[in-house]
From Swiss-Prot:
Disulfide bonds: 46-101
Cellular component GO terms held in the UniProt record: extracellular region; MHC class I protein complex
Protein name: Beta-2-microglobulin
Gene3D superfamilies assigned: Immunoglobulins
The Ig-like C1-type domain, residue ranges: 26-113
Top-level taxonomy: Eukaryota, Metazoa, Chordata, Craniata, Vertebrata
Subcellular location field: Secreted
GO biological process: antigen processing and presentation of peptide antigen via MHC class I
Protein's job: Component of the class I major histocompatibility complex (MHC). Involved in the presentation of peptide antigens to the immune system.
Family: Belongs to the beta-2-microglobulin family.
Pfam families given in the database record: C1-set
Complex and partners: Heterodimer of an alpha chain and a beta chain. Beta-2-microglobulin is the beta-chain of major histocompatibility complex class I molecules.
Length: 118
């Protein structure tokens, strides 16, 4: 009986090691809570999904500088064991500033600019 438990434990450890070995690059979406109007308060959102492993850095930037008062959702996972997180902050859109989301993951470092037309 003890040998069966040993085999089960070894099998579970192999499965955990296999899941840890999977790397999936994040998908990044940058958008506002409501349609953007210059001079009107809004929220800038960066939704990052489908990444593994869970270690990730997500920053919201205005003209290359980190934005203040950023809030982060809890790190959550999907049925396929990839992770997702929402990062957001209040802001006032205008035509002169560049807003972007910068993501650093072991699979990629990438910045996605907010496109007010999408």
């Amino acid at each position: 009986m003890e040998s069966r438990w040993g085999i089960v434990v070894i099998g579970l450890l192999c499965c955990v090691s296999w899941v840890e070995a999977i790397t999936s690059s994040p998908k990044i979406q940058v958008y506002t809570r409501s349609p953007a109007e210059n001079g009107k308060h809004n929220h800038l959102n960066c939704y990052v999904s489908s990444f593994h492993p869970p270690q990730i850095t997500i920053r919201l930037l205005r003209n290359g500088e980190e934005m203040p008062n950023v809030e982060r959702s809890d790190l959550s996972f999907s049925n396929d064991w990839t992770f997702h997180r929402l990062v957001h902050t209040g802001f006032v859109p205008n035509d002169k500033d560049v807003f972007e989301c910068e993501v650093t993951h072991n699979s990629v470092t990438k910045s996605v600019k907010w496109d007010r037309d999408n």
